[in-house]
Amino acid sequence: MLKIIIPTIMLIPLTWMSKPNMIWINTTTYGLLISLISLFYLNQPNDNTLNSSLMFFSDSLSAPLLALTTWLLPLMLMASQHHLSKEPLTRKKLYISMLILLQLFLIMTFTASELIFFYILFEATLIPTLIIITRWGNQTERLNAGLYFLFYTLMGSLPLLVALLYIHNFMGSLNFLMIQYWIQPLPNSWSNIFLWLACMMAFMVKMPLYGLHLWLPKAHVEAPIAGSMVLAAVLLKLGGYGMMRITTLLNPLTNFMAYPFMMLSLWGMIMTSSICLRQTDLKSLIAYSSVSHMALVIVAVLIQTPWSYMGATALMIAHGLTSSMLFCLANSNYERIHSRTMILARGLQTLLPLMAAWWLLASLTNLALPPTINLIGELFVVMSSFSWSNITIILMGINITITALYSLYMLITTQRGKYSHHIKNIKPSFTRENALMTLHLLPLLLLSLNPKIILGPIY
């Protein structure tokens, strides 16, 4: 693990010591190199001795998320260049350092082998994100958004700490690799039901579960571009990852407790998709679509069959790349028009034809067009939920239809129609933006050729 962690730490002095005109290029190139090292972890042999130590271990669930995290840093840096072009030099360096610090915490969270260590790092990711949102956001509401973000996450995760101490007392260890072999199950007592709720609530808020999701649209809308990208792509996956790690420890309690949460997720999935159909704000629409996709992941994790786990991991990776790409596109619109309202940006297809092609591809991956891994993930989840209960197929079908509707609605409102006169003298799309879109789409397309490397713990 250190062969990723140490280079990531060294990116911070690299940023502060670079020449002013080389900051972006240095960090981006070295970030890409680190992400190429992390691809090594995707090859998981059966005797997984190479990748485990006392502090860190990686298995086939954390490896894809690790690769996604490291892949995102250079993309965030590429996307932020225009946003920070007017800032003084030290502030640029501070911004890049925050992103690197956040990536460091995330890498360590996904590979921590101890539950308390995992908890500390899970909370530590909050700090750089909060600074990025409240310092570099666009509107003044960003302070409000930061407050929501902080308090929702903290309120959710404090009971988890108490629950972990209790589990440590009960089982004698909190090491992931040791607890897997613990034979004695937790009985269905009232105290253990509260224990389950305490464990799950932190991750449900992070996912977010419908009803606990109010911080997400706020944080997404107010965050700068890199904040939105990392929030949608990786921070939401922390919730899914934590749930997949902890639900297996708490059986048979999970089977007993899962019903209300699954109902809430299935209901919330349709509700948030319907909210998307009425949005005027572009970033808000993408944020709500994230909530509905993550509701699918919650359902999959709570069903707890091999198929649903495969679907959940595939969907998490696919959604990470897709939503990040959509935020980049929304940001490139925002940099030209200085408004997030979709109607004001209509008719862009005639002015920026290549950008319209990227919009089309991003919308199609968002609505899970057949060859993409989004579809593979959704199919696995739909099949496993159908075998769990036949009625869910109706809800899933409605949700998939509404997803297709709002994705196409987003595409049509931003790209088609007659353009308004205030955007005639718009800047053309930069090579940087096209490269950014290519680097988002490339993994999606390549993974659809060989999806089994991201199907998680079963393979």
UniProtKB/Swiss-Prot annotation:
Protein name (record): NADH-ubiquinone oxidoreductase chain 4
Classification via InterPro entries: NADH4_N, NADH_Q_OxRdtase_chainM/4, NADH_UbQ_OxRdtase, ND/Mrp_TM
Keyword Membrane among UniProt keywords: yes
Membrane-related topology note: Multi-pass membrane protein
GO molecular-function term, one example from the UniProt record: ubiquinone binding
Keyword Flavoprotein: no
NCBIfam families: NDH_I_M
Main location: mitochondrion
Subunit structure: Core subunit of respiratory chain NADH dehydrogenase (Complex I) which is composed of 45 different subunits.
